[in-house]
Amino acid sequence: MYQIFPTPRHFTVTDELVPAGLPVVCLEPALLDACRAAGYDPQANLAEFLTLPGFGLSVTANLMDGVSGAFEMEIRQDGVHISCTDGAGLYYAVEAIRQLAVQTPGGYLPICTVQDAPALEVRGIMLDIGRDKIPQMQTLYTLIDLFGRMRINHLQLYMEGFCFDYPQYRYLFSDETPLTAEEFRSLSAYARARFIDLVPNQNVLGHMEKWLERPQFRHLAECEDGYIFNNL
């Protein structure tokens, strides 16, 4: 039995299969412009998993009315036909195709129809990268891929301590591995191509223990010498 995650609003599938080779993608011009603006390449996205030699798969997509991220898709013998509200809807349709391809042996796709639309406009997740657990860039890229396939469209990176590389203060965290501004820009572009808004979440003094421990900033602490609890 085929499954698509998140579960779409409507999904009907048959026992018939269609060969799924390297895709030939044709987009409505306005939809193509939207994908280019986001840095999303549906042709390359499909080519990651549609690789059956000798069978080109026609994929056509056009715009329809509706909420952001909505799509309607038919997989037929003559190819894949997608209607979507925007680039995000096309991306979600393509990722649904990925899931169907993984579940179908031999490089085929099932003949089916899928219709879906987000129930929530903002579908967010917050990832804590503070307190001595800053991920490597490849880990963050992998997580962004996963979040995109889950149709997360808002990602906050929670930062506490020395998570961000402030050039003027590098002498304070020479032994740390903070993310640089350039790395954040790369992550933002990578997320945008998966229709995710990347939102850095920088805490202020209430959660800046590592900064306030330094003599240069101790005067900003509410209690410069720390707290002592008696009679506990």
Regions found by a protein language model. Give the residues of each.
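Acidic, contiguous N-terminal accessory segments
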Residues: 1-118
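Substrate-binding cleft of carbohydrate-active enzyme catalytic domains
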Residues: 120-232
